[in-house]
Amino acid sequence: MELQLAIDLLNKEDAAELANKVKDHVDIVEIGTPIVINEGLPAVQHLNDNVDGVKVLADLKIMDAADYEVSQAVKFGADIVTILGVAEDASIKAAVDEAHKHGKQLLVDMIAVQDLEKRAKDLDDLGADYIAVHTGYDLQAEGQSPLESLRKVKSVISNSKVAVAGGIKPDTIKDIVAENPDLIIVGGGIANADDPVEAAKQCRDIVDAHTKA
């Protein structure tokens, strides 16, 4: 089970500084969509150049021109790139093929997908490396959790790994861990904590305890 830190609301320098503080406790560090919008793919390059020992995810949320956009993210140092599950099958397949051509991975974000089970089966067949159930900021504000979506997707796929994101914190991660996802994505639960290093360590300890059980 892998742990990912999602960084959304910092500049690239502060993102790299935070990543270096917590890198011993996480496997993947994400340059979130807001950073990409504000600073572009050089933010991915900056993280890749300045933080050792973690994989770098570029959260581009690709919708079209998928092979080109994946190739650009890879050029700037991304190990994993994201595309939206509501994109066309042709776009998903092009993104998968481009990522795999470079030995990289594709994560499909299921935000706004209505029929989770059907789409997850399709994406599994298309070769997605990760399928991520994602309760976005706006639905988190309404009190929604990704747990039920996680169960639905896990029940129907056989090849892709399952990732989960959305409001996960050190005091709620245990419920997520119990569902055995392959990747848990924590954003503000670490990044906005009073002590991000301690928050990351708490998350890692819970993940590791479950993995060893």
From Swiss-Prot:
SMART domains per record: OMPdecase
GO molecular function: 3-dehydro-L-gulonate-6-phosphate decarboxylase activity; hexulose-6-phosphate synthase activity; orotidine-5'-phosphate decarboxylase activity
CDD domains the record matches: KGPDC_HPS (cd04726)
EC number(s) given by UniProt: 4.1.2.43
Top EC class for this record: lyase
Pathway terms, separated by semicolons: One-carbon metabolism; formaldehyde assimilation via RuMP pathway; D-fructose 6-phosphate from D-ribulose 5-phosphate and formaldehyde: step 1/2
Domain of life: Bacteria
Keywords: Carbohydrate metabolism, Lyase, One-carbon metabolism
GO terms under biological process: 'de novo' pyrimidine nucleobase biosynthetic process; formaldehyde assimilation via ribulose monophosphate cycle; L-ascorbic acid catabolic process; one-carbon metabolic process
The keyword Chloroplast belongs to this UniProt entry's keyword annotation: no
Catalytic activity: D-ribulose 5-phosphate + formaldehyde = D-arabino-hex-3-ulose 6-phosphate
Family: Belongs to the HPS/KGPDC family. HPS subfamily.
Functional description taken from the UniProt entry: Catalyzes the condensation of ribulose 5-phosphate with formaldehyde to form 3-hexulose 6-phosphate.
NCBIfam families per record: RuMP_HxlA
Protein name (database record): 3-hexulose-6-phosphate synthase 2
Organism (species): Staphylococcus saprophyticus subsp. saprophyticus (strain ATCC 15305 / DSM 20229 / NCIMB 8711 / NCTC 7292 / S-41)
